[in-house]
Amino acid sequence: MWFVFRPAAIPALLLTLGVSALSPLRPLVSTAGQHEVIPGWYLQSERHVSSSIFSLSFPGADVSSWYRMGPRGTVMAGLLENGVYNETHLFFSDNFKSLPDADFRDVSWLYREEFTLQPGSGQHFTLHTHGISSRGDIYLNGHRVASKDVQAGSYAGYQYDVTKHVLKGGNCLLIKAYPTNYLRDLALGFVDWNPYPPDNGTGIWRHVELSQSGPIRLSSPRVTTDFVPGVRVNDTNLTVKTDVHNIGQETIRGSIKGFIEGAQNQRQPISAPFTLKPGEQQTIEMNTTIQNPSVWWPASWGDQPLYTARISAFVGKIKSDGPKRRKFGIRHIESRVNDQDTVEFKVNGKPFFVMGAGYSSDIFLRFTVERITTIFQYVLDMGMNTVRLEGKQEHPELYDIADKMGIMIISGWECCDHWEGWKYNTEGFGQPWTDVDYPIANSSMLHEARMMQTHPSILAFLIGSDYWPNDQATNIYVDALRRMDWNAAIISSAAKRGFPKLLGPSGMKMDGPYDWVPPSYWFGDRLGAAGAGGFGSELGSGVGTPEIRSLKKFLSEEDMKDLWTKPNKVLYHMSAGVSQFRDRSIYNKALYARYGKPNSLDDYSLKAQLMDYEATRSEYEAYAAYKSHSNPTTGLIYWMLNPAWPNLHWALFDYYLKPMASYFGTKTGARIEHAIYDYREQAVYLINHSNSRSGARSVTVDLINIDGKSLSHSTMKADTTPLMSQKLSKVSGLDKNRDVSFLRLILKDDAGKVLSRNVYWLPQREDVLDWGNSTWYHTPVTEYADLTPLSKLRKADVRVDINIQGRTKTRVSLQNKSNHPAFFIRLNLLDKASGDEVTPVFWEDNYVTLWPHERIELGVTYPQTHRVELEVSGYNVEKKMV
């Protein structure tokens, strides 16, 4: 059975250190319908405040010695903003350990701001919270608006009618943020991903807003449609819903009026009357029909047209609230659990194979549109289509960007702490839930669902991660999602350990691995391997080693020496110290055995990039190859996309936004049309992730030894089918491999255009896996593949020509002048003035291997602020600058 799911400028106040000077400034809000962010905060530890909270909550108190920060930020983010701590210093080596926990863990912090208001007759003021971690007392002008027992939960958003507390002229808002405990509170933590921030994310991490209205207050609009591909195509019925609240003292008759605005200057009016008694709240619906709707598609499948719903509330001809705006897209999500107990998704009627990775927030929960835009550009550049947010829902801007770019989002709550404090959870550390947690969970789910509802990028919400919620919590979550007209999948967890009665099995598997496994693992038929079928909700080989220039930014000379001389040492920039992943012992054992003991940091770094490229490419390729099997793969989430701070694993690009070999392994493995090598079957698979491309294809298969001598040459031909994979033929000549051979697959269409170029380095014998002794994070290897003959490769002479095309593009020509391969050529774009690596940077390909006398051309784009030069190096290619 298929489950069908049917379906928004902040003014800056110029503030001096003397807060009382704010009074003459223009009002923060002054007209009905105006909605503004509290523009900034004065921050101080309660431990360093001599005055009472009560007195500090009145206008005019002197807080000139407090820290001044922006409109949202945790305590640590605010202290960094003020230069109390320096990020470069904090992140270097183990300096993070020196942060004084005593200043944070048991201490509340005060956020204070003054602003001007000019309240008038019949006007009402509402305070909106969206994320205070994890509890707060809220005061306005000496009145406690809410206690920590009400304002509780890092994701719980609330609205407070503060009309009776506002003053004409200066006003003061004071929020006391209580210290967060991940195991006790419904907060947002980092599990074992990295060291915990000393403040545990305490503070006003999302905006606080103030709105002005008449007696009728509106919620943001929600939008549902009856769009069904193949059923309703020429017209779509659309419903706009809003929650209308009479906060006045008498019965009011009024109307909601607005428009649906489309991309082609479409403007359709919508309206509905209402009658509300004092204090009453109703959900009002407005219906209209859109002719020939513009349908929203994931990035590689089509365009991302967006509509806008705009509504206002009127009492007679007087506006009481609005306009409230939300952008939305018209699309159709379906999900089901198939006969193999695997979840399958469809988007607009097409089978949607998830290729994604797990996102991490910044360690101090800092957020910028610029950074998330770059991260999402990298996601698309790698060929991925989905990002998983495990308890890291971030801010509305993230979903706006995903909508515009066509990236699907799987959101949900996090594992291992209080969110999963269930009696049957034998692996987590969270305290058990009590009666007070369920209302917080309800408020959290309502708020997040309201924020996400109109976003077409939402694919699913996971109400559990490693463990499913109990039936009481499940009912609360599902009721809240449905109350907010949820139009995407609701999934009980990311694993198959169990499920709540209401939702049934999740169809997702969480069988690992999380640490290194060889490329051949992914073509196996057990656990997390693709041959076992399924949807891998979080899995990977634990790779993501930054290149040396990045390592030097956060590791000392001794730290870097430890990397290659002490393979079993616990490393501070791995996972948290209590984690299984606190060292690189499993990874290094394989590196030493497969590629040889490193003789320098440079040697270690190069071999690590080889390991990482192999690891990510094989994972994405195996899952793609087996998506058309009888027990199909339906998607995977690589663990992880990006780090919360500078780290040594679980990433596809580093903290400084520099792509690594793991990035380009992914980019190769996730190509929309692709030819891949199955390590287990020694065969070629033809992959098609597009929803429309078809026709004749050819794969040229070449196998050579390390001296460049041909071992086999053949051409395989087949017709490709959209959204399908197919096995072609076995690779010939592998029996002639005496040490290490190179395999090149070149996929072309019927016009001879190259669609994919893919090079493997293959040992004489593959790694031997000990499946029977697998753990939740790793499958041991009893015999490692021998790739050490690569060290015998003769130096290759590679000619490099560059053609700079304007200020943001360059074409690079690489030609191997030698009679043997030029292996694993790295291209690094540097700023001419500083010598620093250019980021963000988008290469068509990188870490490439050239056949004897082969020539290829690669393009690169980058920000126009840089004058660039190119560094070229490789496994057997001398480093040079061009």
From Swiss-Prot:
Main subcellular localisation: secreted
Annotated compartments: Secreted
UniProt enzyme class: hydrolase
GO molecular function, one term: exo-1,4-beta-D-glucosaminidase activity
Any one annotated GO CC term: extracellular region
Catalyzed reaction equations: Hydrolysis of chitosan or chitosan oligosaccharides to remove successive D-glucosamine residues from the non-reducing termini
InterPro entries: Beta-gal/glucu_dom_sf (IPR036156), Beta-mannosidase-like_N2 (IPR054593), EBDG/EBM (IPR043534), Galactose-bd-like_sf (IPR008979), Glyco_hydro_2_Ig-like (IPR006102), Glycoside_hydrolase_SF (IPR017853), Ig-like_fold (IPR013783), Ig_GlcNase (IPR041351)
Domain of life according to the entry: Eukaryota
The protein's Enzyme Commission number: 3.2.1.165
The entry's keywords: Carbohydrate metabolism, Chitin degradation, Glycoprotein, Glycosidase, Hydrolase, Polysaccharide degradation, Secreted, Signal
BP GO terms, sorted: chitin catabolic process; polysaccharide catabolic process
Annotated Pfam families: Glyco_hydro_2, Glyco_hydro_2_N2, Ig_GlcNase, Mannosidase_ig
Signal peptide limits: 1-21
Active site annotation, chain numbering: 466, 538
Propiece residue ranges: 22-31
Glycosylation sites: 86, 200, 234, 237, 287, 442, 688, 773, 816
Family to which the UniProt record says this protein belongs: Belongs to the glycosyl hydrolase 2 family.
PANTHER family: MANNOSYLGLYCOPROTEIN ENDO-BETA-MANNOSIDASE
Biological role stated in the UniProt entry: Hydrolyzes chitosan and chitooligosaccharides with retention of anomeric configuration.
Subunit-structure text: Monomer.
Protein name (database record): Exo-beta-D-glucosaminidase ARB_07888
